[in-house]
Amino acid sequence: MPEREFLHLDVEGVKAIHAEVLGAHGGSTGLRDVGLLESAVAAPQASFGGEPLIKDLIEIAAAYLFYLCRNHPFVDGNKRTALAASLVFLKENGELKDPGLPARSIDAWETLVLDVAASRIDREETTVRLRRLLRRRKK
């Protein structure tokens, strides 16, 4: 069976997500380092010999969350943008109908993002926890 092709995020799309996040929740505008943004957007799409290194939808979403959060490319709103970008990626690829977060689990989502930002978890653990949160979300 052929591998599924995903609709990936691009730099301009992530900038738009960032602007929307700041518009909704406030914060300072500005891009701190375009190279770090480009790197964070490219990492989940990396390939070797024409084969994607990450083939699982949730793992790709976790990679967007992880690299956007850890690379800190924006002046403000990096954690919020990282989570929003991850959820938009999942929505665009049919995993979520609505990228909003249910109020009952907001603390768990916040803990995930804060743990990524503080380097308390690696990309693999980010994937495990994101997968768990998404399963809970569907219940």
PLM segments and residue spans:
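FIC/Doc superfamily catalytic core
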Residues: 1-139
